[in-house]
Amino acid sequence: TINTGTGAITFTGAVGATKAVGAISLTGTGTTTFSSSVDATSVVQNSSTGTTAINGGRITTSGVQTFGNAVTLGATTNLNTTNNNITFTGSLNSSGSSRNLVLNAGSGAVLYTGAVGSSLALGAVSSTAATTTNSSTWVGSSTYDIYGNAVFDGSISGVTNLYVSGTTTINTGTINTTGTQSYDGAVSIKVNTALSAGSNITFGSTINTHSSATTPTVSIDSGSAITTLNGAVGAVKVLGATSISAGSVVTGSSGSIKMDGSALSITTDAISIGATVSGTSTLTIAPKTASTTIGLAGASGTLNLDTTELNYLSDGFSAMTIGSAAATGKITVGSYTFKDTLTLINGTATSNGGMQFTGAVSV
């Protein structure tokens, strides 16, 4: 136990290199510096002010690691526990240049309470734990690979890539990456949420409203890249109004979309539907690029829905719109019977076969 009041604490050499030391408890509002590796039962910085500078590359404990004040990384850093929590209560930043961070808590948790990357972004961050939770913001051009479950209570903005192997609970309004977002496990959404990326967004499993929430609105925007839905959407608890914007949208054979009374809008230049899309509100499918042509029921067009895909659009929508008022590309329709109220909006609409409508139609 070390208490220096307002003074600094400095570990110049390796701690526990021959045999791990016991619990390290530190209290000091000055700068605590680890210049080399640490092997101990636990490491706890009790102070909420001051800075802990981890410059030695590695801290390994059998018990918890808790950093109550701001943490800076002066080297590529590995923090390891034996199935115990790693907690950052204060901010976490790189020092000098972007530093990589590897966290291994086993069956313990990784908890970020303070902002990450607000001064100088981290590099590649890998977190292995039962659950990784951010309660504040993640910013900067870092990559985050989370092995285990994730809870996002704080916003994520400007990071490069984000990957979660387990389940994801989204309780924040913004997740923005300049690169990819990949969610292998089930995703549950608690609040109105906007997911945006400069590259592909991929959902490997289900997406639902969280059990404690009521129909949050959801926006998914992968720019000119691909949004892929490989699991059922809304099968357990439907989302609120949902918009998907991408260069290409793909729903796999298990990627059904159940909207009930919530509206669904898909804006894309290419689409592949492999499972049922159902709802009682409105469905809009519009081109992302104004000049994109639309082909329906075997007709040619870049944004194309063949007969099988049209059959996946279940009867029951209050209105279905294909195209947009801003679009200039031609809509070409093969032989098909549309049963819901349908609006086709584009520069030109033509039929290569027998269009039949059992609901209202406007062209």
Where are these regions (language model features)?
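Extracellular lectin-like interaction modules
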Residues: 1-363
